Amino acid sequence: MKRELLCVLLLCGLAFPLPDQGIHGRFRRGARSYRATCRDEPTQTTYQQHQSWLRPMLRSSRVEYCRCNSGLVQCHSVPVRSCSEPRCFNGGTCQQALYFSDFVCQCPDGFVGKRCDIDTRATCFEEQGITYRGTWSTAESGAECINWNSSVLSLKPYNARRPNAIKLGLGNHNYCRNPDRDLKPWCYVFKAGKYTTEFCSTPACPKGKSEDCYVGKGVTYRGTHSLTTSQASCLPWNSIVLMGKSYTAWRTNSQALGLGRHNYCRNPDGDARPWCHVMKDRKLTWEYCDMSPCSTCGLRQYKRPQFRIKGGLYTDITSHPWQAAIFVKNKRSPGERFLCGGVLISSCWVLSAAHCFLERFPPNHLKVVLGRTYRVVPGEEEQTFEIEKYIVHEEFDDDTYDNDIALLQLRSQSKQCAQESSSVGTACLPDPNLQLPDWTECELSGYGKHEASSPFFSDRLKEAHVRLYPSSRCTSQHLFNKTVTNNMLCAGDTRSGGNQDLHDACQGDSGGPLVCMINKQMTLTGIISWGLGCGQKDVPGVYTKVTNYLDWIHDNMKQ
């Protein structure tokens, strides 16, 4: 009887856990983990399980209430009213839920985040980067930054839960910031088994130009320019005639906006560019300032390639935002085919190789795609353009490939064509007298074949690292008696090893960029032209020498 009772008790124990079992039990396994998070793309914010938030409804003026449930975002519309106090930065419009205290910011173009505090067009930082509010999230080692709101940073001195986090630019994101006034923007990374700080690879804005030009929309511009597009002189921000205006030196946050006892151009509301108040025909109005954006050529958000392939490495378009893909309509069938690579050198102009256009295609049969990582798969931020015209160098020799350069003008209804973003940007043109040391390491990129015998182009953008050959090694003698002129330069992979491991351009890469880093900016040194095979040991690729064509480029761009 006792044995039977003991068996019954044991069975009950299996069926009904003891009261304190839950203290040590590990119940949270699988997909429904309490660590499940949700990503709200419009605000680029990550939310934890059961967190809720408001967000604007797409293509609607309504607002919806969202909740993170097991990794899924569940939303429904709710009534809202205007916020009782300003909570949004950079000209964002604040709306508050009618029956609870949460709010949502309707952000102007170029700004995202819970409070419109993230500037998606900021591609570099000024001075120490204390006011940098861009989206760079990569450390100098290539490590990805950790979200400032992560619980692993709760004991760190700088995290998104500090009382003054918003002022410091910290929030529910992993973008580089400089909250402690260090030398430049930094972030936390996981390294060698622990969480530590590391400077970011965010590029610095060109020095010496901050007084004459502005970066992004000019929200952080603090120069002394004070003339408008009509050459009118700006009114001081503390002028008595501005009483009652939204943006004056009397605002509580005027210092943060750059407003004060001066008449310098500013952009306190996140408008398209710096502006100021002026008097026109005895009436108070405002005008944009007569300023140009700073050059951000050659700047990028480089991501270290993860996959090695024949001839190079798979890469992302953000590492080579100047890379263009040129397509041409098929002659006898619908659709289009990939033609060549190209390189964006200004908003409306792309350089390529002359030999790509031997068939003299009508301009309306050509298309240029910018911002694409995969050759035939559209990218999220890609930009597509028809061609207004293209110019092949008048002295191009289709036998020797001398003067192998062409210039394509993108079609646009305005003077602005390509819009700068993390995926689209220009490469710098070199100085006329540029002479780089022999064996300087440079980069090329393109959608070409992995090897000469392959029947297919690469599905994804590749990059390769090569070194500039001395002129004494860039001769006919070293290239099997092929003609080599002073308009060409040579570059190749100088490492020892089998041919399969060597980096090089290949068929399909033609017209693409060979860029070298000069003063932390990627500068266009060559245009991919021709070669003997692909990735052969001690056989360099041949490139059009861009410094020889600067006058030709500028003259044709002015026409």
Swiss-Prot record:
Cellular component terms (Gene Ontology): apical part of cell; cell surface; cytoplasm; extracellular space; glutamatergic synapse; Schaffer collateral - CA1 synapse; secretory granule; serine protease inhibitor complex
Similarity comment: family membership: Belongs to the peptidase S1 family.
SUPFAM superfamilies: FnI-like domain (SSF57603), Kringle-like (SSF57440), Trypsin-like serine proteases (SSF50494)
Glycosylation sites: 149, 481
Organism: Mus musculus (Mouse)
Name assigned to this protein: Tissue-type plasminogen activator
GO BP: any one term: platelet-derived growth factor receptor signaling pathway
Signal peptide: 1-17
Disulfide bridges in this chain: 38-68, 66-75, 83-94, 88-105, 107-116, 124-205, 145-187, 176-200, 213-294, 234-276, 265-289, 297-428, 340-356, 348-417, 442-516, 474-490, 506-534
Cross-referenced SMART domains: EGF, FN1, KR, Tryp_SPc
